[in-house]
C-alpha cells in the first residue's frame, strides 16, 4: 500500500500480530493519515495479516472519533470535496499511546495532534 513504508508496515504488522495472539497492547500510533479538505484523520497502529486491514483511531470529522478498523485500500479511494486524496502526514511523530490519543479525542470531539 502506498501509505506505508517498509518500517511502518513491519511495525504495524508486529502490533497486529501481538493483538491477534491475545497480548494486551497499547502501541504508539505508527501512521497518521488525513484529508486536507474534509477534516478526517486516522491514527493507525496495527495492521492485520492481510496487509490491508488497519486498526487505530478514526476521526471522520463528525465529533465522534472512535477506535476501529479500516481498510487501507478503501482509504486509497477516498477524495475530499476538492478532489484531494487521503495523505500521509510526514511530520507525525506519536507522543503518546493509542489509548491516550483516543481518550483525548473523546474529550475534545476530534483528534488534536
Regions flagged by a language model, labelled:
Residues 7, 36, 47, 75-78, ...:
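Low-complexity, intrinsically disordered/propeptide-like segments
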Residues 30, 41, 55:
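Conserved beta-strand and immediately adjacent loop positions that scaffold enzyme active sites
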Residues 38-39, 52:
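Short acidic/glycine-enriched loop/turn segments that link adjacent beta-strands
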Amino acid at each position: 500500500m502506498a501509505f506505508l513504508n517498509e518500517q511502518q508496515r513491519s511495525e504495524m504488522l508486529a502490533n497486529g500480530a501481538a493483538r491477534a495472539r491475545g497480548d494486551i497492547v497499547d502501541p504508539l500510533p505508527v501512521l497518521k493519515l488525513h484529508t486536507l479538505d474534509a477534516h478526517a484523520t486516522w491514527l493507525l497502529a496495527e495492521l492485520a495479516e492481510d496487509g490491508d486491514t488497519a486498526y487505530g483511531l478514526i476521526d471522520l470529522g463528525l465529533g465522534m472519533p472512535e477506535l476501529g478498523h479500516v481498510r487501507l485500500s478503501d482509504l486509497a479511494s477516498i477524495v475530499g470535496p476538492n478532489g484531494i486524496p487521503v495523505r500521509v502526514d510526514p511530520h507525525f511523530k506519536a507522543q503518546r499511546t493509542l489509548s491516550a490519543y483516543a481518550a483525548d479525542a473523546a474529550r475534545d470531539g476530534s483528534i488534536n495532534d
